Amino acid sequence: MKLIKWLKRYQTVLTFQFIASVLLFYRAHKMNMLPFKYEVILGVILILLWLIMLKLSKPKKRKYRHEKRKKARPAFGKFLSILLSIAMIFASNMLAKTNGAIAKITNVSYETTVISLITLKDKGLDHPKDVNNKTIGINTEVNNSKVSEAVSKLSDKIDFKIKKYNDFANLADALYDHKVSAILIDQSYDTMFLEKHLNFANETQTIWTYKIKVPVSNTRSNIDVTKEPFTILISGVDSRGDVSEKSRSDVDMLVTINPKTHNMLMTSLPRDTFVKISGINGRDKLTHAGLFGTKAVKNTIENFMNIKIDFTARVGFQSVIKIVDALDGIDVYSDKAFTSYADSTIHFVKGTMHMDGRQALAFARERHAYTTGDLHRNQNQIAVMHAILKKVMDPSILANYSDLMDAISGTFQTTLQAGDISALIKMQLNSNPKWNVQHSILAGTSRKRKGGYMMPKTAIYYFIADESSIKQNREYINDIRDGKTVTVANSDANGISQ
């Protein structure tokens, strides 16, 4: 009874509001994203709210001893104060959640390699024990040390024989021809089999996996991202699990930003571009550089384009769905009407279309609807990225900030530091500058040839970049960094260079 009376006192209610106010201000300040003027405004608002609730909640003194006190106003004031306290605590938790999400995406400390034991479906080989005393095939030419580690772990569970192959084509044929009962591979390489076995994903199953975490070292950049130009590599990976899992880089986009001139350039590199892969003695598709880690992709592009990349970001494809939905959709222009090849339930109209997450991902991955295939897909990817950035840079996104943090958590990693992200957000909120965003795509031709590092004896299509286009795109990037304004010619309705 005494506790209830204590809780009903206006002093108690206002004390709760004071504590909630201090907590909210502390969390907002700790985030280091609000410009000073907004912190001052927040502080003034919190003080005014407390004073108003004091005025409403505190009972008036009686002029006469037998005069009745009015209870309606103090009761309403206490009720309103409680609601404000709850709202402030909720907002404080949201800010803490945001800090946690940013800390998670900027803490890139390891990459994960997943080794998978794969069998054909409907063969009665559904568990590791079913492969006991049978033959397992491996590829000894790629990632041999990690596969050997997985072989050792698997041998603790079952007995088996190993048959070695020197390329993925022969390894896949051995599985389909029943020369081996299963194959043990780095999961990120399973797309190698699609060149000869298009339905590999549907015809096989993974019956055992072994994960190996490898520490990665990232040299911290001393760039002040609010004053100095920088280039960030955005690598879209097709990993099925956590974004830390090594996977092909299906999307490779360079975003060059000059915070002083407010110029931004997006440069898209076709995933099949034939390049020398950093760290190995061979050339292959740029997408396959991702199999050796994000650092390999960064170094490969730096050497290929003769440019400097300051930061990297890995984005899981599933995060596109979550991010776009958290932004309440994006508006993107489509130059033709078509039905998604991957999902026949998704249809696109010609013109500007408001897309949800599923539609945006399907649009970004579509190539079958276009005569230029991957090149047009690169244009779509840039269009989606531009639309996302346009939404993210709008101050109104603060209303959806918690949902956005949920979307990127676990599906996004970057070598940008938490302080860098905070500084960029603070800069945008403080001055809300209008950005000049330009887009360009590396030009070239598709040719069928042998000699790729992964499948040297198999003739497949590679994208051979034009030297003139490499030079032009390098100049675009350097011009942005030098403070010049770049205008990319021959752009479509999304502003993308053809």
Segments (PLM) and residue ranges:
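Membrane-interfacial loop-to-transmembrane-helix junctions in polytopic alpha-helical membrane proteins
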Residues: 5, 9, 34, 66-76, ...
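Cytosolic-side transmembrane helix boundary signature
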Residues: 42-81
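Non-catalytic, solvent-exposed segments at the cell envelope interface
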Residues: 106, 110-113, 118-121, 127-128, ...
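Short, Lys/Arg-rich, polar N-terminal cytosolic tail immediately upstream
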Residues: 1-3
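Transmembrane alpha-helices and immediately adjacent membrane-cytoplasm interface residues
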Residues: 77-104
